[in-house]
Amino acid sequence: RRFAQQSFGTVNFSNHGAYCGQTYRVGTGAALGDLSGMPHGKPDWTNSRFGLFIGAAPAQAGNPFQRQGRELAEARSRPENTYRYVVVSPLLPTSSSQASGDNNRWLAVKPGSDLALVMGMIRWMLDNGRYDERFLSQPGPAAMQAAGEAAWSNATHLLIHQSGHPRHGHFLRGADLGWALPPPSQGSDTAEDVYVVQLADGSLAPHTSPQPAQLWVERSVTPAASPADPAPGALPVRSALFTLREEARRMTLAQYAAECGVPAAEIEALAREFTSHGKQAVANAHGGTMSGSGFYTAYAIAM
């Protein structure tokens, strides 16, 4: 800690063994909005029907690998034989071979290039409408409950998109528009500002509204006046999902393919298969993101 924080002045320090999947824990923790707790998911073997294992072949790697081996054996031996999985790895794993049956396949990838594969999948999914629109449209807990969903996301939350702005890339908050802070939530003494979303009628609302919000937003808003800026101009904003799509489009599918060594047709086929199972598809990479870009790889997988 002293070497990293005092010598280099970085806050990017975390106390955990790299061999145990530190980049995966931190990357997924960032995606889930909890860097201190570093939450991360495990495959729901009972309810899933398709598994994508990136650098973490079940029964051979991953965490906990012994339990995953047992879970894989159970899923693979179901009478209905509906569980399918793909193992992404530079090396042929034992969990994806002729001896393991015909309900799986191995996808070879260049070492350390998994991020390019995942971003290629994300680009194809967003370009072809292969995403869970109902889930992604719920901006907060109230909307989630009203829609009968199990979770909500920040896909609809608006981001400041003005080059040179001190908060370029940050979320737009209610205070930016002059909205009053909401009362503290139950069990807390501190009020937390809301995020801003656009509703179907084009109006702006807090993310706590009990209704879905728009996924694809690119517009301008007028910030609240302040002593430092008594006459603010229009501020360009974008929704988070719109921003993700634009970032994914910075490279073509062919460029992603060249980077990771997986043909573009294979990336498309994998993305199509992954999205054909709806909420019954899972992705896991615990221990499989140990590279220089591991944090970003884990973050992309979690998205």
Stretches with model-predicted labels:
Residues 17-19, 37-97, 106, 246:
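A conserved hydrophobic secondary-structure block that centers on an alpha-helix together
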Residues 2-4, 66-70, 100-107, 122-125, ...:
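Short secondary-structure boundary/capping segments
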Residues 56-57, 90-93, 111-112, 272, ...:
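An acidic- and aromatic-residue-enriched active-site/binding cleft used to recognize and process polar
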Residues 1, 20-24, 59-62, 92-97, ...:
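Flexible loop/turn segments at secondary-structure boundaries
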Residues 268, 272-303:
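Acidic catalytic cores of enzymes that act on phosphate-bearing nucleotides/polynucleotides
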Residues 53-58, 103, 236-237, 251-257, ...:
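Glycine- and acidic
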Residues 1-47:
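Anionic-ligand anchoring segments at beta-strand to alpha-helix junctions in alpha/beta enzyme folds, i.e.
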Residues 79, 86, 96-277:
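Long, well-ordered, tryptophan-enriched scaffold segments
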